[in-house]
Amino acid sequence: MTNIIRQFLRQEAAGGIILIVAAIIALIMANTPAQGIYHAFLNLPVMVKVSSLEIAKPLLLWINDGLMAIFFLVVGLEVKRELMQGSLAGRDKAVFPAIAALGGMLAPALIYLMFNGADEVTRQGWAIPAATDIAFALGVMALLGNRVPTSLKVFLLALAIIDDLGVIVIIALFYTHEVSMAALGVAAASIAVLAFMNWRGVGKTSLYMIVGLVLWVAILKSGVHATLAGVIIGFMIPLNVKKGPSPSETLEHELHPWVAFLILPLFAFANAGVSLQGVSLSGLTSLLPVGIAAGLFIGKPLGIFTFSLLAVKLGIARLPEGIGFKQVFAVSVLCGIGFTMSIFIASLAFGDADVVLSTYSRLGILIGSTTAAVVGYGLLRMSLPRVR
């Protein structure tokens, strides 16, 4: 395993633990007298004005639209690296986690729709349980230390990266509403400039960031979710240049600690603070939270494990070396930790306008993700040999 992947896994695992702490603090603040401070912080008005261009949003939306674009930039860099020279490079390496990820997105969505398909409003949240929080999942896996084989860590990493790619496609296709053609035109021109820079082998990441900022503003104004700008920029930055170190790997190395230790924990803090005031047992057992929790805890392992088993039995793919189906099942349960990614999709599906839907969708995510984390940890602990 390369040094960059080792470092990635260490940072994701440590970041996952900080993420959990941030979410717990948010839940405590949202349900104590500190809730006033918590909500005042999230609603803090922030305005950026350059000439006639003005963007004014509360801090919560700057976190969700701005900082999360940086997260998706790192995702774009990771996916490109893994596709070209990492754990997804070549058909043999990519097929098994790709098929597993496909099952892990289809089954949770179908289970969610079994509960919510008849309701026109809640049906929009079908993609909520399709996501996996890689930082949280790796954080739980890290609790078992060196008992976890490298091949299993790389499998989870590859699976989660493909899952992220699927989520990006879902956001672009299904969670984009009113579109401004003028802003899309500026976005298209920005992408063309980035593509030309990549083709010419421009290695200065600062130039990509300048054009990328224009792209982010254009996509934000277009009605398409602004985080997609991050993915596009990540794919456009070259992995290799004729002289000097890799621009893509250098930028990923610089940004990853900020994402793991600041951006994702801040996102969790800003979005996990669900007030339990007014929450009832009947509401908690209603179709929305039950569908989300079932999609995460039942749908994820069902889809990942079934598709993995079929792929191997049909000869389409083979198990990675050093991994058995017991470990695959344990990892498939861990992938039911949707947390930040599921909360992100819930915010796109329901927004913050409907407090009831927002509250119960987040509670469903927290229940499903927590159950998946506890059970997944237990199964993984039982399936791995003890290190003496």
Swiss-Prot record:
Main location group: membrane
Disulfide bonds: none
Subcellular localization: Cell inner membrane
GO MF, any single term: sodium:proton antiporter activity
One Pfam family hit: Na_H_antiport_1
Transmembrane segments: 13-33, 36-56, 59-79, 95-115, 125-145, 154-174, 179-199, 213-233, 259-279, 287-307, 328-348, 363-383
GO biological process entries: regulation of pH
Membrane topology: Multi-pass membrane protein
Tagged with keyword Acyltransferase: no
GO cellular component terms, A-Z: plasma membrane
Top-rank taxon: Bacteria
Reactions that this protein is recorded to catalyse: Na(+)(in) + 2 H(+)(out) = Na(+)(out) + 2 H(+)(in)
InterPro entries: Na/H_antiporter_dom_sf (IPR023171), NhaA (IPR004670)
Keyword flag Acyltransferase: no
Alphabetized UniProt keyword annotations: Antiport, Cell inner membrane, Cell membrane, Ion transport, Membrane, Sodium, Sodium transport, Transmembrane, Transmembrane helix, Transport
UniProt record similarity statement: Belongs to the NhaA Na(+)/H(+) (TC 2.A.33) antiporter family.
HAMAP family in the cross-refs: NhaA
Biological function: Na(+)/H(+) antiporter that extrudes sodium in exchange for external protons.
PANTHER family recorded: NA(+)_H(+) ANTIPORTER NHAA (PTHR30341:SF0), SODIUM ION/PROTON ANTIPORTER NHAA-RELATED (PTHR30341)
Protein name in UniProt: Na(+)/H(+) antiporter NhaA
Organism lineage: Bacteria, Pseudomonadati, Pseudomonadota, Gammaproteobacteria, Enterobacterales
